[in-house]
């Protein structure tokens, strides 16, 4: 970097601030003379120049520090987001490995994975409730039996869902003569993923 050759600046000595207005000192001429105006002008210019440089450099340091903080915060945020996505993808992969599906050569998409998982859970719930004849072992406790309550709650949800599907089907002009079982729906869905993927 090239530097300019500048002559050294002369600094004015600090003025005695305790001198009285009428008192004349070598550094401070008597008020009313033309010299005091010159001294005031020099002092204000040097104060502005030195103070101005300090403020500008402080501003530069401040804005540079803010930029560095902003960049650092952004990098940390990006790293947190990267870790979050990595954990999410690992969880999806673990779910893909647990859900039975036919095609192992092609990875299921996230929406396919979630849909299959939801339907698989529904089919397992229906199977368990059917096999246990509305009683779940291990849930029996003194008082009212929780097995039938769970069974009733499940059937209530299924009825609501079927009603919503019927309303949606009626709006679209589609009618279902016979509702499919959960396992049959699940196997149909697996087959459609196999054919479509």
UniProtKB/Swiss-Prot annotation:
Residue numbers spanned by region Disordered: 1-82, 178-197
Residue stretches making up the bHLH domain: 72-124
Tissues showing expression: Expressed in pancreatic tissue only in acinar cells. There is a complete absence of expression in intra- or interlobular pancreatic ducts and in all islet cells.
Localization of this protein: Nucleus
Entry annotated with the keyword Repressor: yes
Role played: Plays a role in controlling the transcriptional activity of MyoD, ensuring that expanding myoblast populations remain undifferentiated. Repression may occur through muscle-specific E-box occupancy by homodimers. May also negatively regulate bHLH-mediated transcription through an N-terminal repressor domain. Serves as a key regulator of acinar cell function, stability, and identity. Also required for normal organelle localization in exocrine cells and for mitochondrial calcium ion transport.
Notes concerning its domains: Lacks a classic transcription activation domain and instead possesses an N-terminal region capable of inhibiting heterologous activators.
Designated name of the protein: Class A basic helix-loop-helix protein 15
